[in-house]
């Protein structure tokens, strides 16, 4: 970074501003110390430990207690640590103490697949441990043969990923792992998988202008076409995205095309309307005197009270100065309701009263299943053409059973924890036959699919100008001076942080692409210049479209930003053909009607009490 530092110095530095920031750091550290002390006190009062405590406590025990350390050193004849590329320094220290220099350590890992930096993983730890083992007389073995992809796809992946990761190690960038070419084990693709084994389907325009939604429609059409041509099944496809916020464009497109799909984990599950309704209904069953949640339950498809009916309940509530639950269970608004709303209200009052008595006495899964049976909620969703919603309801019921929780409040806290914590990625993975799977790249780690689609390829990774904690430079505060410049030390730390994030983004692309067995497809949107030629792209596509890889940007093309055509471009990833189709905004994919429109139900094994009629 010497060149960058000289550039910054050349622009001049506001020394007074730098001094003020330096003086603010101790105050920031003091504030952090107070917050940390309160957090520690709260954990002590609750007798709870977080994951950081478990790691720190285990390491301290091994470091400070010789008897405990010797006990566990004798316990293990050998140590095998898998996925070592996703460990951190503290975990490495624990392994070192347990090994005690006896040469009994065996680690397995691939630094090119280290993608959990946001959880504290440090790919540098893997490199350091690998070098230490070899210095101590151990041996390193590289497993370069891919038993997943066939010869031509492996050749294409090598050509695609080599320029992305680079081939030379840089001692100044120990967090960047260079590319190592894969070797194929399998010669031919499976029958029915003809060339091209790499495809790009890109829609012209911006995301704000709906280009990603159009890209989703084009992809859905291509999936239908591939399945119609046989012998592929919808279950052979997986759409992998950098982040779950890209899911909706593909979910909606598949739904419009009548293609069955399953969204695996992600943030979207608990945001689905049918799941929000059921969680709200569980709250109403636990406490029907809560007017807000009860009103939401009554308006849900389970009870389907009309807006007019809800208005009359609320009006009676205000006039009588009582709660909606009292109005409902005593039928006080009966004279104001239509015949239909009167029946809905009576049915809702009977079901809520009956199930309210079960809350806290039986597991929440039993309460939820009793509600679903009493209201035929899943059947109603299927009848309304929402088979996906019915599958989501089945998944929620399975989650409720798996949790083993009795109290509704405790279960809702459990759900909120899953929704809001990082553990939502890859949780509750369900197996389904005959449905396209949509998941994040992190959730796909360790999996493989016949056809992998990398979705929203122009999406960039995270980033921003927040507070940084640099291991060498300390806390770095992003406060601009009067010339809108960040402090020089912050810019130095930010440059290093951005470089580490970029290196992990490259590894994330490597993981996504190498999940494919037969075919790799890239999907997303692309911008064009005023003359109709291709603009420089962002995200992974920006990396892959350059001259060193696919050279997409170098191909002559004349797109009409308001047209309805599709442009075919024959690209090469090395010697592997890559067919690229660019769709103008008005293009409409001709989706042939499918013979079967029903979507498969996810069958989850539940214990007898939940299956009883």
Range-by-range predicted roles:
Residues 379-385, 491-505:
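Short, solvent-exposed helix-loop connector elements
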Residues 37, 42, 46-52, 57, ...:
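P-loop NTPase Walker
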Residues 463-499:
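Conserved catalytic motifs of ABC-family nucleotide-binding domains
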Residues 7-8, 74, 81, 85-303, ...:
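Conserved motor-region signature of P-loop NTPase helicases/translocases
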Residues 61, 212, 216, 501-502:
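A conditional alpha-helix N-cap/helix-loop micro-motif detector
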Residues 5-10, 29-33, 99, 104-105, ...:
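Active-site-adjacent bridging/hinge elements
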Residues 281, 480, 496-513, 517:
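Anion-coordinating catalytic cores for phosphoryl-, nucleotidyl-, and glycosidic chemistry
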Residues 1-70, 404:
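Conserved helicase NTPase catalytic core signature
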């Amino acid at each position: 970074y010497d060149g960058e530092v000289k550039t910054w110095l050349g622009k001049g530095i506001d020394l007074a501003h730098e001094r003020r920031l330096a003086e603010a750091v101790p105050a920031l550290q003091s504030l952090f110390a107070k917050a940390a002390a309160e957090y520690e006190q709260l954990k002590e009062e609750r007798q709870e430990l977080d994951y950081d405590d478990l790691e720190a406590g285990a390491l301290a025990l091994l470091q400070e207690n010789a008897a405990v350390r010797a006990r566990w050193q004798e316990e293990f004849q050998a140590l095998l640590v898998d996925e070592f590329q996703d460990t951190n320094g503290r975990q490495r220290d624990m392994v070192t103490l347990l090994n005690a220099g006896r040469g009994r350590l065996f680690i397995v890992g691939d630094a090119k697949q280290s993608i959990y930096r946001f959880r504290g993983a440090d790919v540098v730890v893997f490199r350091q441990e690998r070098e230490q083992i070899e210095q101590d007389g151990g041996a390193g073995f590289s497993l370069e043969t891919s038993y997943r992809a066939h010869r031509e796809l492996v050749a294409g992946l090598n050509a695609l990923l080599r320029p992305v990761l680079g081939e030379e190690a840089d001692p100044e960038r120990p967090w960047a792992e260079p590319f190592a070419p894969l070797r194929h084990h399998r010669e031919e693709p499976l029958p029915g998988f003809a060339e091209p084994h790499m495809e790009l389907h890109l829609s012209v325009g911006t995301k704000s202008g709906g280009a990603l939604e159009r890209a989703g429609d084009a992809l859905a059409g291509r999936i239908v076409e591939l399945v119609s041509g046989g012998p592929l099944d919808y279950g052979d496809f997986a759409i992998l995205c950098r982040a779950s916020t890209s899911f909706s464009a593909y979910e909606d497109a598949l739904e419009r095309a009548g293609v069955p799909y399953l969204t695996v984990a992600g943030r979207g599950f608990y945001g689905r309307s049918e799941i929000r309704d059921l969680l709200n209904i569980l709250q109403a069953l636990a406490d029907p005197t809560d007017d807000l949640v009860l009103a939401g339950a009554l308006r849900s498809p389970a009870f389907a009270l009309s807006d007019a009916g809800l208005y009359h309940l609320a009006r009676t509530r205000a006039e009588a100065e009582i709660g909606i639950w009292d109005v409902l269970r005593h039928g006080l608004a009966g004279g104001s309701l239509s015949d239909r709303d009167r029946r809905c209200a009576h049915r809702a009052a009977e079901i809520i009263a009956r199930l309210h008595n079960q809350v806290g006495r039986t597991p929440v899964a039993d309460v939820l299943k009793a509600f679903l049976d009493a209201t035929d909620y899943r059947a109603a969703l299927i009848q309304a053409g929402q088979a996906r919603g019915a599958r989501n309801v089945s998944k929620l019921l399975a989650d409720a059973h798996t949790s083993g929780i009795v109290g509704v409040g405790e279960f809702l806290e459990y759900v909120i924890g899953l929704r809001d914590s990082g553990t939502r990625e890859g949780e509750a993975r369900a197996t389904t036959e005959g449905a396209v799977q949509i998941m994040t790249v992190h959730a796909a780690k360790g999996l493989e699919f016949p056809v992998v689609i990398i979705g929203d390829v122009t999406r960039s990774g995270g980033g921003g100008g927040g507070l940084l904690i640099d291991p060498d430079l300390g806390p770095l505060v992003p406060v601009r001076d009067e010339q809108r410049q960040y402090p020089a030390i912050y810019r130095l730390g930010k440059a290093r942080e951005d470089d580490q994030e970029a290196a992990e983004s490259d590894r994330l692309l490597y993981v996504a692409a190498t999940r494919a067995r037969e075919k790799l497809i890239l999907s997303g949107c692309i911008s064009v210049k005023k003359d109709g030629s291709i603009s420089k792209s962002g995200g992974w596509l920006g990396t892959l479209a350059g001259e060193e890889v696919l050279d997409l940007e170098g191909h002559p093309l004349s797109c009409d930003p308001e047209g309805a055509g599709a442009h075919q471009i024959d690209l090469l990833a090395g010697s592997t053909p890559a067919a690229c189709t660019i769709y103008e905004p008005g293009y409409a994919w001709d989706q042939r009607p499918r013979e079967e429109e029903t979507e498969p139900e996810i069958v989850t094994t539940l214990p007898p009490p939940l299956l009883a009629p």
